[in-house]
Amino acid sequence: MKFEAFKIVPVGYIRKEKNVFIEILPEFREGMEGLREGDWIKLILWFHKSDTPELRRILKVHPHGNPENPLTGVFATRSPFRPNPYTVKVHKIEGNRIYIDWIDAEDGTPVSDIKIFPERYDCPKENYQSTSRLKS
């Protein structure tokens, strides 16, 4: 598999201190204008610690890392091992920082992009119940 390189510039980083939040870099803070407390957003992250040529070649995994689960294509899982290690999460905005309760990312994970999550297009399901038969 041959990869063509291109550059992605982080707009901020995940920070895990007393609270978990996204630290937006000063040169991108103007891009937060218009976001309000309580808005839902999508985050696009770069799993930088899963970014090696070997890990990018993994295209099938056992979901939840459990070998009892059948091998499944990474696009149908939440595995951090992907050809391009991105993930998307939904969070709320509170105050002048983007605070989040929890995220499946490490302190220092680069944030590549933030997009508004308009209810009419992408309404989150508050009471979602998984029908998955996979073992955790």
Swiss-Prot record:
This is Probable S-adenosyl-L-methionine-binding protein PH1056. PANTHER family: TRNA (ADENINE(37)-N6)-METHYLTRANSFERASE. Residues 8-126 form the TsaA-like domain. It holds the Pfam family TrmO_N. NCBIfam families: tRNA_TsaA (TIGR00104). The keyword ATP-binding does not apply. Belongs to the tRNA methyltransferase O family. S-adenosyl-L-methionine binds at residues 48-49, 78, 106-109. The lineage of its organism: Archaea, Methanobacteriati, Methanobacteriota, Thermococci, Thermococcales. The keyword Ribonucleoprotein does not apply. InterPro entries: TrmO-like_N, UPF0066_cons_site, YaeB-like, YaeB-like_sf, YaeB_N_sf. Keywords: S-adenosyl-L-methionine. It comes from the Archaea.
